């Protein structure tokens, strides 16, 4: 919806043309849901960003048992987009590389660890580095590596980190009553560009993932602006 126009003063300060329409926007995840088909086609979506967000939509107004509802009106259609998230997803990788490895490279040192049959010896990562707000509602919960031994390598720890975030997203998915009816999930965000992480997520969820290479919040916001009246 158009809620106003750019004033002469704002135009002079920003360079945006005067009288350009100002369109009511939305948050980054609802915007991403527009261009992935989550909102209008009902296709579940996962955004792998700093946080990991699982989104699905429902007709009309729905108050879910788990997750945050976001009401959307598209034309004459009222939808509810439900968001469930883990707070540390890509953020956990940033912590690992920035604080632990002090490295700018996001590549595994040992490519053998990417083999799906690689023996991980029950090494697990609990990803809630900054609390958990959906299933447990506990801001003080913290992350952990479980199963460490003297032979554990840095690449194994990184694989465990990606697997741990995948299992946390699986826990969110299983909290949605009808998620067993989903036949596929679309994947967006910076983490979606990592082939190994995307495949790990698909394996853990037990469902096909389709990466949306050019979809994201920016594109969704542009579609909102294009459809405004």
Positions of PLM-derived features:
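Glycine-rich, mobile lid/loop segments that gate access to catalytic sites or pores
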Residues: 2
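Active-site core segments that coordinate phosphate-bearing ligands/cofactors
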Residues: 7-188, 192-229
């Amino acid at each position: 919806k158009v809620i106003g126009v750019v004033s002469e003063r704002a135009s002079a300060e920003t360079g945006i043309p005067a009288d350009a329409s100002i369109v009511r926007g939305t948050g980054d995840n609802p915007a991403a849901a527009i261009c992935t088909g989550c909102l209008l086609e009902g296709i579940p979506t996962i955004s792998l960003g700093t946080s990991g967000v699982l989104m699905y939509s429902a007709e009309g107004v729905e108050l879910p048992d788990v997750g945050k509802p976001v009401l959307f009106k598209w034309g004459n259609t009222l939808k509810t987009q439900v968001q469930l998230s883990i707070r540390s997803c890509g953020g956990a990788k940033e912590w690992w590389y920035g604080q632990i490895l002090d490295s700018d490279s996001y590549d595994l040192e040992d490519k053998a660890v990417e083999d799906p049959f690689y023996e991980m010896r029950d090494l697990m990562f609990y990803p809630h580095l900054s609390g958990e707000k959906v299933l447990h509602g506990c801001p003080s919960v913290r992350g952990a590596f479980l199963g460490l031994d003297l032979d554990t390598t840095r690449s194994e720890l990184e694989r465990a980190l990606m697997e741990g975030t995948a299992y946390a997203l699986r826990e969110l998915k299983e909290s949605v009553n009808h998620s067993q009816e989903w036949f596929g999930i679309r994947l967006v965000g910076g983490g979606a560009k990592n082939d190994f992480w995307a495949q790990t997520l698909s394996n853990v969820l037990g469902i096909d993932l389709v990466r949306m290479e050019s979809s994201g919040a920016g594109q969704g916001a542009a579609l909102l602006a294009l459809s405004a009246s």
